[in-house]
UniProtKB/Swiss-Prot annotation:
Glycosylated residues, chain numbering: 132, 184, 209, 220, 249, 281, 403, 424, 446, 516
Role this protein plays: Involved in cell fusion during mating by stabilizing the plasma membrane fusion event.
Organism of derivation: Lodderomyces elongisporus (strain ATCC 11503 / CBS 2605 / JCM 1781 / NBRC 1676 / NRRL YB-4239) (Yeast)
Residue ranges crossing the lipid bilayer per the database entry: 22-42, 96-116, 286-306, 368-388, 544-564
Subcellular location(s) per record: Cell membrane
Residue numbers on the Cytoplasmic membrane side: 43-95, 307-367, 565-659
Keyword Glycoprotein: yes
Membrane topology of the entry: Multi-pass membrane protein
Gene from which the chain derives: PRM1
Protein name as it appears in the record: Plasma membrane fusion protein PRM1
GO biological process: plasma membrane fusion involved in cytogamy
Family recorded in the similarity comment: Belongs to the PRM1 family.
Amino acid sequence: MLRNYLDLPEILSQVYLNQYTILLVLVVVKLILLKESLIDAISKQIINDATCNDDNLQHILNGVHDAILKNIDKLQYSGIVFVVLILKTIRELTSFFIDLLLGTYVCLLTAVVVGTTEFAFDASESIIQAVNVTVVAAADEIEDGLRGLSNFINDLVTGFNAIRTFFTGSASTSDADLYRDRINLSLGNLKDKISIPSTVLMDIQNARNFSMNELENLNNETQSLVNSPFNLVINKLDAIKLEINRYDNSSLQPIQIRDACLQTVNRVQDSQTVLIKVVENVSKWFLIVLAIIIACSLAYAFYIELRRWKRLSEFINEGDVADSEVGYRNEHNIYDNALLYTMIKRFGISVNERVIWVISYMSSKMAGIVFAFGIIGIISAVLQLLMIYFVQQAVDDEISTMNNSNENFEMASSYIRSMNNYINTTQSSINDELFGDIIDTSTKVNNTIAEFVDNLDSAVHSIFGESIIASAVNTVVYCTIGRKLEKIEAGCNWLAENVKIDIPEVPSEILRELQNISFLQPQNLMENFKPILDLYRNSVHLELLISLIFLAVWALQLIIGLMILLARQGINASGAGGAGGAGGTGDAEGCDNYTDNKVILMRRVTPLQIGSPHSLTEKERQLYQFPISKPRFDRSSDTLSSFYPPTSTPGRIEYPLHI
């Protein structure tokens, strides 16, 4: 008889066509397509040299550069003119203030002093003249009286001498002359000493001619001292104003945008090369892993087919095969299912028939295809997501590297720093030249004011001395002049501390605007790869979702299987109840056996069919009185049965068929 089935070698010759290998090959194709697509997307020029040929931006940057320098020069000139005006105003106001205060109060003091001294001098002269007239007249009268008294006394003395001579009889003219000289009374020099000398009146006349020349000279000297430092600063500022462009700005050059653009192009192209290498390396390793998995799947398929052939052979040679179709199909199901065979036959695990049915339902050929599609789809999606992940990491690394060492950003930042340094240096130089002498000026003005106050005190003291009006004059001078001068001194100090030119630095907005220029920031260009990767990632997510749906459909078979079991159990229960009511148990038993395959109602209307022939079991041979010591299959000719003649195939024993 010609064999029309495939034996084991013929089956193994098609093992490479198993569904797992085919699906894995599709995964390889999918990865190759993804690799080529990523390389094509990465290789596209997101920037090229043509972008750097646009000179418009260079002209704009040059214009901004020149505008900044010109504005600095204009600001310097304006600042100098403004400061000169301020200094001239302060100088004139200070001179005017000093002249106003000091000149006014010199005039007032002169009037007060002159009026007071004139009154005092006139009174003194009148008193002196009156004293001289009165004292001299009195002295003359006293002199006349003394002379008369002296004559009287002398006459009296002469009489006394005559009487004494009369009585004594002796006469001496010398004694009479002696007494006359002693009794001669007169004011003599005392009369001249009583009158006030005429030199006093001469001194009074000279004192009338005093003046306030000291205060007037002090006013003029103070104005000259105060004006001198202001004049010095103003002259220096005028000289600087004429040389406003003498600061060296040759080291400041505008950003060369073309060079920066070419650097960006080269940097982006280098990053693209790195990303392409990452895609190639990752895909290469994934393809190697898939090749190993495919080889393993071939080995697994080879092993599965080999085991399946052996299981079928064991099933054919199985002696204890049930004598019913249900039992036969049950045994065939166990041998045909690798999982059930391993659990029951190899490990001897006792499994309920319903559990066996559920496992068979979920591991059927149709369900297995769905399961295989789901698993292989998940593997494919995971590999693609891993490839996209590695590319994403490479892009992030490149962007991070560019952020850490961005030459164009450093170029822009360096330009801004250089410009700000130039502005600060220029500002410092201008302030030193403009206001460097302001401190000296304020110091000189303060010293001048202090010297002026000292000289004023000396002048007032020299004029009024310890007179009764000296204290009042000092108080008036301090309240009217001294306090004002203290305010001037405080104003000079404030001027030295606060007057300066502030040149504004280049605003940070310009640096941010430079950062926003795309071809100056390669990391911004690299950000364009992220939307592409997101697009691929979304498509792979869709594939993963479809694969999960396949697995969900396969898992749904468990629910469907359990529902079928419950339906069969309900039908069996109703069929068993109907058969028992009819008075027989044979049908009920037949129904129980047959409900493992079909519905009872279908069995009643389905005609009986002759089953497939198979070898007799030991019980059947005993039933048919066959010797049980003979083998079931023996190709030798001496094992022929005496009951049945040999068939056309020599060496083959044909046993009765069990229908």
